[in-house]
């Protein structure tokens, strides 16, 4: 497979503000989780039980080097608050959750906000009924939309394309979404969870448009599959 081409490697490592350590004591974290859970339970009397609330923090250091002379690294941090509860009505029970993740703990919403949203989401699931088969517009909430985009990213990945196991083989330049859909890859957004100055081969990350007005504009390829497919990483 070989290394990525030397001219594609990152020449500099920009500061993307990915590292914001959170020196929180365990007792303080427990207090935040308790506030979060209480807000969920207090949201509605139909919220009857909790599956738990959590507060977490992590720090990491990513370093990559190769025999082309590349050596780069950067620190990063992730902090989160989450809560999951159970609601009951007329003998039926539903479970849902809410969470928040940020590079900087100062950017997290208040624990009570996370808990209240967990309660709201759970109660909203009560009383649902099945629809008859129909053709109708569908509005996807952000949580579901992220999953749909995840399926797109899997379908345009090098391995799936090379094995021809993707439904988007030979789809470059063709419509794959409605014309109102545009999807950008923006790896240099400060504090963003997936921002990075280089990929896992040391290749410099760049902004690009994956879908433009519904038309597929690019694939996600590492060096190995890019060479197999006669394309660029």
Predicted region positions:
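Active-site bordering "gate/hinge" segments
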Residues: 1-207, 212-215
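C-terminal, non-catalytic macromolecule-binding modules
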Residues: 215-233
């Amino acid at each position: 497979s070989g290394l990525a081409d030397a001219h594609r490697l990152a020449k500099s490592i920009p500061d993307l503000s990915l590292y914001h350590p959170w020196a929180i004591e365990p007792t303080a974290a427990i207090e935040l989780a308790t506030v979060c859970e209480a807000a969920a339970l207090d949201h509605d009397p139909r919220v009857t039980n909790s599956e738990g609330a959590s507060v977490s923090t992590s720090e990491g250091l990513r370093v990559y080097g190769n025999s082309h002379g590349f050596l780069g690294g950067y620190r990063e941090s992730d902090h989160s608050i989450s809560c999951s509860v159970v609601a009951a009505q007329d003998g039926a029970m539903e479970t849902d959750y809410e969470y928040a993740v940020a590079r900087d703990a100062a950017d997290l919403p208040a624990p009570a906000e996370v808990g209240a949203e967990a309660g709201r989401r759970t109660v909203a699931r009560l009383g649902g009924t099945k629809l008859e088969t129909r053709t109708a517009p569908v509005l996807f909430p952000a949580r579901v939309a992220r999953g749909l985009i995840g399926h797109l990213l899997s379908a345009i990945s090098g391995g799936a394309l090379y094995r021809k196991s993707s439904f988007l083989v030979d789809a470059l330049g063709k419509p794959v979404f409605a014309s109102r859909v545009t999807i950008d890859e923006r790896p240099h957004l400060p504090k963003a969870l997936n921002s990075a100055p280089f990929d896992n081969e040391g290749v410099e990350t760049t902004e690009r448009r994956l879908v433009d007005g519904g038309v597929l504009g690019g694939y996600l390829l590492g060096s190995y599959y890019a060479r197999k497919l006669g394309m660029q990483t």
